[in-house]
């Protein structure tokens, strides 16, 4: 916990407004940086390329192609993300650091093989009408993106947040520059620039990993042994990523809202733009989440379990437990307040923002509900992260499973309704699971001492 938590606590100890603002800015950039850089990078490439790329629809084809690469690679690697993070954390706790890198190579090999096989089949049979260059670049991009998520989740688990944001900035700067340099080659040039930039990003992430870890063995498949498997974490990783994207796929492939773009890929103009903009509003909530979880909560969490392991007095254990619970409740309440304020500010600025971007005011109602949904997603993410600290995997599995089911059912109902209802399926699904997660968290915190001592 030393890395980011130590830096944030150092800023907060100054007890100045500047220190507080610096800590929030630092946490916001780290917490939401990769998301924001990804969104801004793709949008920037599109905006700057429009006047130069022919045919006119090539930029849209590029943005849609990249969106699918991101979405499908996230869902594909979801089962491995949390599983490998848990494996690595356990080996570091056991002081078996030499096992980390060989098993990372094994995971990368499996991800590369799976993404290459799936990508090759899709390139051959689903994109038969496209050029060989486009199909090869989509295949390469799919493999690279899949490996990026594994490397990113690994470094996140090791609390290398600052390094991640720096590498993502360099990677997306390289992506934008390469894509713009090759824009004269149309869609193929833009996609080649994207793949080149993402390769730079992946190399940067791998460089961070190799700098911190070494081993006498190159590869080891211990992670795939039965004793190290975590089926619940595999399902959670898959279902969470599926839940985030399933409503988008439903809008893309619905006859009334989706339009064909290139090959089998479709997009929903009415749904996609507000969603992209709404996710830019999560920065304040992510800042508060990271600041409060990695400082106050983690500090008391460590103190509580250290007291339990070291046999401290009951009074001290109870005091640490109360402090941990209070820090957590204050943190959740602060996330709700700050994210709510950010949503209200965006509501007020939305008409001007859409006008400045040249987007019709018709998108305003959907943007509003998407901002609310994104805000609830931040709260939901924060709570399930706490459940992971408490090792309540079964609860998280139920929550993300319910999220997927509710998102599918409610989005289907809104699609069958009228355009005024669009976006409410995703928002209502998040609202229900957010309330459920708050309820379960409150219950588990009340019984934390009992479960700590009696259920071991």
Which stretches of residues belong to each language-model region?
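Membrane-interface helix-capping segments at transmembrane helix termini in multi-pass transporters
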Residues: 53-64, 94-103, 117-143, 355-364
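Small-residue-rich midsections of specific transmembrane alpha-helices
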Residues: 63-89, 241, 245, 275-300
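Membrane-interface junctions at transmembrane-helix termini in multi-pass inner-membrane proteins
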Residues: 146-166, 368, 372-398
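Transmembrane helical elements of multi-pass membrane transporters/channels
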Residues: 197-295
């Amino acid at each position: 916990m030393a890395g980011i938590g130590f830096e944030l606590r150092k800023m907060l100890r100054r007890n100045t407004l500047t220190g507080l603002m610096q800590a929030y800015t630092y946490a916001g950039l780290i917490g939401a940086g990769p998301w924001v850089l990804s969104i801004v990078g793709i949008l920037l490439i599109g905006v700057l390329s429009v006047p130069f790329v022919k045919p006119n629809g090539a930029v849209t084809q590029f943005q849609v192609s990249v969106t699918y690469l991101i979405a499908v690679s996230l869902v594909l690697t979801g089962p491995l993300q949390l599983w490998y993070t848990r494996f690595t954390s356990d080996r570091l706790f056991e002081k078996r650091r030499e096992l980390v890198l060989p098993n990372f190579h094994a995971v990368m090999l499996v991800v590369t093989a799976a993404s290459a096989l799936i990508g090759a089949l899709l390139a051959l049979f689903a994109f038969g009408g496209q050029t060989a260059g486009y199909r090869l670049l989509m295949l390469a991009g799919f493999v690279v993106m899949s490996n990026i998520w594994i490397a990113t989740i690994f470094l996140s688990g090791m609390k290398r947040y600052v390094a991640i944001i720096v590498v993502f900035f360099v990677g997306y700067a390289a992506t934008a520059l390469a894509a713009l340099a090759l824009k004269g080659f149309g869609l193929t040039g833009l996609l080649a620039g994207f793949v080149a930039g993402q390769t730079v990003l992946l190399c940067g992430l791998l460089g961070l990993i190799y700098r911190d870890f070494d081993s006498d063995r190159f590869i080891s498949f211990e992670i795939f042994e039965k004793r190290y498997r975590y089926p619940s974490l595999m399902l959670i990783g898959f279902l969470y990523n599926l839940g985030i994207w399933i409503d988008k796929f439903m809008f893309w492939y619905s006859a009334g809202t989706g339009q064909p773009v290139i090959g089998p890929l479709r997009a929903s103009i009415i749904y996609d733009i507000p969603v992209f903009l709404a996710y830019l509003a999560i920065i304040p909530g992510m800042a508060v989440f990271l600041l409060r979880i990695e400082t106050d909560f983690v500090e008391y969490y460590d103190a509580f379990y250290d007291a339990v392991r070291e046999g401290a007095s009951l009074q001290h254990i109870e005091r640490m437990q109360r402090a941990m619970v209070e820090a957590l409740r204050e943190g959740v309440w602060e996330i709700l307040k700050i994210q709510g304020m950010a949503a209200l500010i965006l509501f007020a600025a939305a008409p001007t923002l859409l006008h400045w971007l040249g987007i019709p005011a018709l998108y305003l109602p959907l943007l509003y509900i998407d901002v609310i949904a994104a805000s609830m997603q931040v709260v939901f993410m924060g709570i399930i992260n706490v459940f992971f600290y408490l090792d309540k995997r079964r609860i998280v599995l139920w929550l993300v499973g319910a999220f997927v089911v509710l998102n599918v059912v409610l989005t289907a109902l809104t699609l069958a309704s009228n355009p005024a209802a669009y976006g409410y399926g995703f928002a209502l699904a998040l609202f229900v699971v957010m309330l459920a997660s708050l309820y379960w968290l409150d219950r588990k915190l009340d019984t934390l001492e009992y479960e700590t001592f009696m259920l071991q």
